[in-house]
Amino acid sequence: MIYVLLVLGFIILLGGAELLVRGAVSLAKSFNISKLVIGMTVIAFGTSSPELIVSINASVSGVPSLALGNLVGSNIANILLILGVSGLIYPIKSENKSLWLDWVVLTFASSLFIIFSLNHNIDFNDGILLIGIFIIFMIYSYLRGSGYLSGANLGDDKTPNSEVEELSFMPQSKLNTVIFVFMGFAGLAVGSELLIDNGVQIARSFQISEVAIGLTVIAIGTSLPELAASGVAAFRKETDLAFGNIVGSNIFNIVGIVGLMGLIDHLEIPSRVLQFDMWVMICSVILLLPFMFRWIRGLGRAFASMFLLLYLLYIFAIATDVKNIFDFVSNI
């Protein structure tokens, strides 16, 4: 029954995120907000909303280790698992010359996350700084996408537009829009509660840590919106969108959600996460370097298969309770 409730939690959570995105997009359109801004804010928030709500719920429920595992695990899964699957569907190329700037921000944010974690704690001051970086990045992204920054626009705005147009079934009246938003938040709340309660029970029944459940099962589940968005983008051959979804979501997870966790309550960092999982996370980001700078023309099926193999090795390392990155490398 626990597993049924866990799966039900995933379904309700993802359904809530979908309803929230559709309702929020409709609400934004009613205020004549451009598709560009909608795509860069509402859609980006929608794909990361499961991580956000699950992490907040876990933190206030007294299991912050599950929240931490969810965030770090999602960032690893987004790159190795989701880009791996997307690359198998269609070779992913970074054609947008400005996308490397987002990769630099992600690398900086990931490095800052590790530095802040060296004292095994993300506190209020760390949270303030991360949220400040998030706000600056959002303002910069808007100015770049709107063409206010010369030579740094998005190239074309079909990326955000195509995501907005993809939402064909939209609430038509303001009442339905409010209902969609309300039901979306309700679905996120109920789904996250089911995920956390049953995820913790499963962890305890197998005598494994809550952070391990967060790094694997919960992380993969909350990354499903990114899988759907990047998978569809790869199928439609919109390769920049596949890269952009992952990089943007990972930035949001670190500077947005981790920052918020620091503001709500200090986030404790277990030694194993600091000595192993965070290094896997930053190494995954570095793996994107040759693709972002176009030293390698694209993430084809060979590299996609390598990404998936690395993710399987990472899951194996968690299952065998590898304590740090040096043990992992020596055992390969």
Stretch-by-stretch model annotation:
Residues 1-332:
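Hydrophobic alpha-helical segments, chiefly the membrane-spanning helices
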